[in-house]
Amino acid sequence: MMTENSNADLKEEVKEDSTGDPGESLGIKAILVGATGAIGECLLGELLASKNYSKIVVLGRREAQVPEKYGVDQKAEETSGRLKQHKVDFEQISNDTVGEYFKDNDVFFCTLGTTRKTAGSAEAFHRIDHDYVVNCAKVARDVGVSSVSYVSSQGANAKSWFLYPKTKGEVEEALKNLKFKFTSIYRPGLLDRGFKK
């Protein structure tokens, strides 16, 4: 994991702010993009299972489902207003179209990503993995979200000759240049989705 503008990642920041009472919520408000993917659905489950988060907003093309292993009553979380999901058109991301969803949140989590094969072309892949992510981050920054946490990839490098690591590296550079108060970038290796395609 790499962090920018901070000596602490989000978990360390939470620990420093904690009162020590495990039953007391820190009241962190989070917005998550990419909650229907392999990492995103697990992150959504972790956020909802944590008492540290008082509100989780999810943006996506379709509604996300919390994996059963987290023991979260998704319907109850939605009814209480702690979990709010909004379907959005990622081709139309701007302050005007989604700014209200980002407003008043403390941290923007982004696990959005695809593959060239799934996207259908190099251009479509770049649009999803780069443009959608950076456009969402710009909105988050513009409305005052102080922290961004982005799931990139092992080997990300903006100067790479290869599409996937180059795109991920370009996103990392764009996020650093947006100058959030806290920028956390995670570079996992291969993902084990737990099933065979």
Identify what each model region corresponds to:
Residues 186-192:
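Conserved SDR Rossmann-fold cofactor-binding beta-strand/turn motif
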Residues 1-28, 69-78:
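Eukaryotic N-terminal low-complexity, Ser/Thr- and Lys/Arg-rich leader segments
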Residues 36, 62, 114, 119-186:
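Conserved Rossmann-fold NAD(P)-dependent oxidoreductase catalytic core, especially the SDR/UDP-sugar
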Residues 24-52:
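N-terminal Rossmann NAD(P)H-binding glycine-rich loop of SDR-like oxidoreductase domains
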Residues 193-197:
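NAD(P)-dependent short-chain dehydrogenase/reductase
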Residues 59-65:
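Short, polar loop motifs at secondary-structure junctions
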Residues 54, 106-109, 146, 181:
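Conserved acidic residues
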